[in-house]
C-alpha cells in the first residue's frame, strides 16, 4: 500500500474517533427522551405519531412484549413489500413499465430487506419501478435499520439495568430512532449527494449514442434519497446493480468519504451509548477498540 493510502486510512480513522463521542451523546439523549438540538422541532411530530397510533410513551414493555412487537412489525413490513412488488405493474411512477416481480424473487427480496440483509438477486435497473424503490425498498432500508439499532439498544439496557420491570417500548424506540437519527441525517446528506451529482428525479431512462455510435440506455431515478439510507443503515440493496461502484450512486471522492462515514458512524456511536448507559465510558471505548482492531485486520 502507498503512503497516500495509509494517510487516507489514518484520516478516516481520526474522523471516526472524533465523531464517536458526540454521536453517542446524541443517541443516548434521543432514546432517553431528553433534550437535543432537534427536539424542539421534532417533539410535536413525535407526540402526533403517538396520538395517531395509540402509543403510551411512558409504558415499559417486558422482553417478550418487545420481541412480539418487533416480530409483528417485521411481518407486516414483509407482507407490504411483497404486495408492492407483485402489483408493480399497476403502481404509479413506473416510466419503464416494469412488470410485477415474480413470486419467488419477490419473497426473497422481501425477506432480505425486512431483515436488513438486503441481498439482491435481481438487476434493479430492469426489475424495480420508482414507486417500489421509494415506498418499498427505501422505506425498509429505514425501518429494518431502525429495528437493528433498537435491538442493540435493549441489549445495552439489559446490561445497564439491574432491576427493572421492562426494557423499554419498541414503538417509542423505533419512532425516536427514525425521527431523530435516521431521517434528519438522510435529508441533509441526500442534499449533499444531489449537489455532488447523484440523480434525484422521476424521469424515464435516457437513450444515448456513445462516441463509437452504439446505443446506450442511461438509468436514473430517485437515487440520492435511497443511496443515503442504504449506507447509513448499512443496507446492501442499491438503486443500481453495481451499488456504490456505480458513478450515479457515488460520483466523487467527497461522496465516497461521506458513505464510508455513514456506514460506520452509528455503529461507532453505539459503543459510546453503551459506555454512557452503564455509567462507565471506558467500557464503550474498550468495545470500540476491539471493533477497530478487527476492522484494521480486514483492511
Label every model-predicted segment.
Residues 1-299:
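Membrane-proximal intracellular helices of multi-pass ion channels
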